[in-house]
Amino acid sequence: IDQLRPDSISSAQRALPPICIVGLGLIGGSIMRDLAAENITVFGYTHTKAGVRAATREGFDAHNDLTAVLSRASSTNALIIIAVPMHAVADILDAIAMYAPNCGITDVVSVKQGVYELIQERDMQIRYVGGHPMSGTEDSGWGASK
């Protein structure tokens, strides 16, 4: 277990690609906070202006222009974490296919089968690894993230 502690990981092991989080609600926002606390380059998208204002006021790199965020992900070879409700995943994947066609993708969406079916429909399996959220509450939005 000590090998997994952050203070036991070498700087070479910490050389991660930038992380792009699409969806800065409870889970996406919490991931952003944790990554930033570890000095990992992280930026993200939320569709709400209020979410962008709140996140940027706290010093986080958040935007509400999905095209710009995904273009940046592409140019920095970022890993994209999809953290949106299931009903929004198809549109997000379509945007990723258009603006970040070579980035790795994972997700923290609450269901796996539906996400994977959408991934297959877009022939994105080679760059996708499904994830699972390990936190959550009844609250939502940037303000609920910790």
State the predicted function of each range.
Residues 121-146:
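Rossmann-fold dinucleotide-binding core
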Residues 37, 98-102, 121-126:
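Short helix-capping segments at alpha-helix termini
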Residues 1-64, 70-72:
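NAD(P)+-binding Rossmann beta1-loop-alpha1 motif at the extreme N-terminus of oxidoreductases
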Residues 54, 114-117, 137-142:
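Short, charged, surface-exposed secondary-structure boundary motifs
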Residues 47-48, 84, 108-110:
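Short beta->alpha hinge that forms the Motif I/post-I loop of the SAM-binding pocket
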Residues 99-119:
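ADP-ribose/adenylate-binding Rossmann-like module
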Residues 66-104:
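Rossmann-like NAD(P)-binding element
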Residues 41, 62, 104, 127-129:
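Conserved beta-strand segments of alpha/beta enzyme cores
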